[in-house]
Amino acid sequence: LEAAIMDVVTSASPPVGRTRAVEILRGGRSKVVAQYAYDALAGYGAFAHLRSADVLGRVDEMLAAGRLRSTGGRFPKLRAA
């Protein structure tokens, strides 16, 4: 899961925040996912079997451990640390 999170964070363009990364990993079908072709990313839908809260929890663990960082601001984006 951590490798997939890191892959989404580093390959998504434009960059994504916590909840969008979770949406991509769980295979969400929002307009934004289609608009920016996030559904073409390797990790798209790979963790559809997990609850959103579980995937988000892992993202938060990676932030706390310093493996990811947040840009901050009103719409924070994730970056590899």
Which ranges hold each PLM region?
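Accessory DNA-binding and partner-docking regions appended to nucleic-acid-acting proteins
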Residues: 1-81
